[in-house]
Amino acid sequence: DEETFQDVKNILVPIPACLMGLARLDMPSIVITGGVMDAGPDLLTLEQIGMYSAMCQRGEITDEKLTYYKHHACPSCGACSFMGTASTMQIMAEALGLMLPGSALMPATCEDLKEMAYKAGKQVMELVKKGIKVSDIVTEKAFENAIMVHAAISGSTNSLLHIPAMAHE
């Protein structure tokens, strides 16, 4: 409705854009993401495909092995399962206080994600009752917290562009 905002985002650009939009709207808001993709066999991720492509070009692995890696690097729905921009920004949203604790990196295929979405809905209604808006949550202290968390997780450098843009809002 027009009194609350819940949004589901899961790739690198929409998350910062969503957070900036929430800052502009300045209304009771909670973000819930669609979760993180499962890792492939032997913890294979999309991030490794470039390395395997180079290995194939050098003759270190076969075309068949490269094709196998390409077909198994993204075994489920969800954000990339490495510490790229999407995962970093999901963690930043949680560190800023716009996601429920523990929700930033939940697996997309986890049944608990539905429960977290339900809790997010209940929480946003509590924010409405209490009149708590984004500007009440995302304070200078919240940004300091997010920056410390970013350093602790060795987050994506792209987020170092997104965080000041969000603060500007």
Model-derived regions: residue spans:
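Alpha-helical support elements that line or immediately flank enzyme active sites
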Residues: 161-169
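Residues at secondary-structure transition points
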Residues: 103, 160-161
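Active-site cavity-forming subdomains of large catalytic enzyme subunits
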Residues: 1-145
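Flexible, glycine-rich loop/tail regions that form catalytic "lids" or insertion modules at the edges
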Residues: 147-149
